[in-house]
């Protein structure tokens, strides 16, 4: 007669390992795999957000804690093998469009993220979420993802020095002979090759290798690997709600909300499909999964980071056998352990993380192949959405142009009845904003 194992019984009750045909060992391996593919965020996110004036160490801690909170809620309440972290694209929008582009203080931008999280939390328990998602044309959904990909690419090329400002042509090619530029190109090639051969952790490996090479060449100062946990005080509860509800910042809140809505829904369904967790094409416990996402957004903003969202890198853990929330809990524990790695994160230069941004841009733009380019009434709004994001240096303006042009072109071509009501509402609101308040 076997001796009862209280720990095993607890894990079975919490995560239903047997029912999901998995084991403790498999779930831990899946969690480690997911962690390796997404841990680059603890380096990239503080670098991006610190450009707004936010304290690097505090953002590092906020990033680790936001990931841990999101993953714990996802694992323990929703029981899905899906990890969450500050979204790439949303952090770039926060820094380069909202704070640096619009001149919004980072404290106010955090308040916008917080409000968007509360809105997301509210609709997580209502049926309007599906109505909103389904009301947005597929061409615009894919175009938004592709446009953000190009926006990230432009940021990456700028940060690496590959693209520089040029008074005559707006932008131009930088000095390719510069060591930092060459190292960025090397880092990008490393990621591409490792990704091709399905080497887990390709992005973080590239970042660490380029950091090591640059330190050896004297281009960067190495500050160590392990150290004390930085203070969270500089960003904790520093949200400033005064002046938040202006026309321009309401648009910012809308963009944070809309992009995360698409991101979370698409990732949750996509990863769950790969794991075989969908029932009749739908995701059981969807409300609990969205609750985890919105909780992470609200908590992250309070701690001091931009919007948190489910990570597509979770698919790597699913491929390794992850089927339950135990995978997400393992990811949470590993990110908490990373709190002691602040010196390493502070040692990484911007040109070492630029390849990661560029590669994420590659992944995000792949969805534009699903746009119906033969239908000009679908193609033009999608195209405008994509190109306005990098050229106007604003994700919000890209979304605005997409919605306005979609409604207008459908109206002028006699297809007004095919336009979802949500598109009309958003298009009119953006048009009013531009007409009254300008860009």
Where are these regions (language model features)?
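Helix-loop-helix hairpins and the membrane-proximal interhelical loops
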Residues: 2-58, 171-173, 204-287, 430-432
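Helix-loop-helix junctions within the multi-pass membrane cores of secondary transporters/permeases
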Residues: 7-45, 66, 87-145, 273-368
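Residue-level signature of catalytic and energy-coupling elements of molecular machines
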Residues: 28, 48, 132, 201, ...
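Hydrophobic/aromatic residues within the transmembrane alpha-helices of Major Facilitator Superfamily
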Residues: 32-39, 69-72, 76, 157, ...
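Membrane-interface helix caps of multi-pass small-molecule transporters
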Residues: 47, 72, 76, 97, ...
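Loop-to-helix transition at the N-terminal end of transmembrane alpha-helices
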Residues: 53-72
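Juxtamembrane transmembrane-helix boundary signature
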Residues: 68-88, 119
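Membrane-embedded alpha-helical modules
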Residues: 102-216, 220, 329-439
């Amino acid at each position: 007669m076997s001796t009862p194992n209280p720990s095993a019984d607890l894990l079975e009750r919490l995560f239903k390992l047997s029912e999901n045909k998995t084991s403790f060992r498999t779930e831990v391996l899946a969690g480690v795999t997911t962690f390796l593919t997404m841990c680059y965020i603890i380096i990239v996110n503080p670098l991006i957000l610190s450009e707004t004036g936010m304290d690097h160490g505090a953002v590092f801690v906020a990033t680790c804690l936001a990931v841990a909170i999101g993953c714990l809620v996802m694992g323990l309440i929703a029981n899905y093998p899906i990890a969450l972290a500050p979204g790439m694209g949303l952090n770039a929008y926060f820094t380069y469009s909202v704070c640096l582009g619009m001149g919004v203080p980072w404290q106010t931008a955090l308040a916008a993220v917080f409000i968007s999280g509360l809105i997301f939390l509210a609709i997580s328990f209502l049926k309007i979420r599906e109505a909103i998602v389904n009301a947005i044309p597929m061409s615009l959904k894919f175009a938004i993802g592709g446009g953000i990909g190009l926006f990230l690419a432009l940021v990456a090329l700028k940060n690496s020095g590959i693209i520089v400002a040029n008074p005559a042509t707006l932008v131009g090619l930088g000095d390719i002979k510069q060591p930092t530029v060459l190292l960025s190109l090397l880092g990008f090639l490393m990621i591409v090759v490792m990704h091709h051969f399905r080497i887990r952790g390709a992005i973080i490996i590239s970042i660490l290798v380029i950091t090591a090479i640059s330190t050896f060449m004297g281009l960067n100062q190495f500050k160590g690997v392990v150290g004390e946990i930085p203070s969270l005080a500089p960003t904790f509860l520093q949200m400033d709600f005064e002046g938040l509800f202006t026309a321009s910042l309401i648009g910012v809140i809308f963009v944070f909300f809309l992009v995360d809505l698409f991101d979370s829904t698409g990732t949750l369904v996509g990863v769950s499909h790969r794991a075989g967790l969908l029932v009749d094409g739908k995701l059981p416990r969807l409300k609990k999964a969205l609750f985890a996402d919105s909780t992470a957004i609200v908590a992250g903003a309070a701690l001091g980071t931009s919007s948190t969202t489910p990570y597509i890198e979770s698919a790597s853990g699913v491929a390794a056998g992850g089927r339950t929330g135990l995978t997400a809990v393992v990811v949470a524990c590993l990110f908490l352990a990373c709190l002691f790695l602040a010196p390493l994160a502070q040692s990484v230069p911007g040109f070492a993380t630029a390849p990661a941004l560029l590669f994420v841009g590659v992944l995000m733009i792949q969805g534009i192949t699903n746009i119906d380019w033969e239908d000009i009434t679908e193609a033009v709004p999608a195209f405008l959405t994509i190109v306005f994001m990098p050229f106007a240096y604003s994700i919000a303006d890209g979304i605005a142009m997409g919605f306005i042009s979609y409604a207008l072109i459908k109206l002028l071509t006699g297809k007004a009845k095919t336009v979802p009501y949500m598109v009309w509402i958003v298009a009119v609101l953006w048009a009013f904003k531009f007409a009254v308040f300008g860009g």
